[in-house]
């Protein structure tokens, strides 16, 4: 099991949340905290956009899905879009199985997410 590293940065195009490692019940609160903080920053960002980069995530459990869903719902209320970046089955499969791909826009790269 790999420890979770998560943080966010405000870029010209969006607030980007970088996630690396395993997202499970023991690490999801850290993810949730960073997502909440990123949403707070995004409310004053010109594009009102949060991009969550999950490319370096090795395991993505249901607690992580719940954190993303909470972020999406809070963003919707605040008028801030939330987009995901994922390119491998460890992250995509749980999102697809739970049909969260119907509400999240998912892109293979951060660049693609920013261009949309």
Regions found by a protein language model. Name each.
Residues 38, 113-116:
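C-terminal alpha-helix
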Residues 2-36, 56:
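STAS-typified acidic loop motif
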Residues 1-2, 116:
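Actinobacteria-biased recognition of intrinsically disordered, low-complexity terminal regions
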Residues 25-104:
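Amphipathic alpha-helical interaction surfaces in cytosolic regulatory modules
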Residues 7, 85, 107:
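General small-molecule cofactor/ligand-binding pocket signal
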Residues 18, 99, 109:
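Residue-level signal for pocket-adjacent positions within structured domains
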Residues 104-109, 113:
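Short acidic-hydrophobic, aromatic-tinged amphipathic segments that line or gate anion-handling sites
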Residues 11, 89, 111:
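Residues that form or immediately flank small-molecule/cofactor binding pockets and catalytic motifs
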């Amino acid at each position: 099991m790999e420890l979770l590293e998560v943080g966010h940065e405000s870029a010209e195009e969006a607030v980007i949340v970088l996630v690396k490692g395993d997202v499970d019940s023991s690490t999801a609160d850290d993810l949730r905290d960073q997502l909440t903080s990123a949403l707070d920053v995004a409310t004053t960002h010109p594009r009102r956009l949060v991009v969550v980069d999950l490319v370096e995530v090795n395991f993505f459990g249901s607690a992580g899905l719940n954190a993303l869903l909470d972020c999406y719902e809070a963003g919707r209320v605040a008028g801030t879009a939330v987009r995901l970046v994922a390119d491998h089955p460890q992250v995509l499969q749980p999102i697809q199985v739970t049909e969260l791909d119907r509400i999240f826009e998912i892109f293979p790269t951060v660049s693609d997410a920013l261009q949309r």
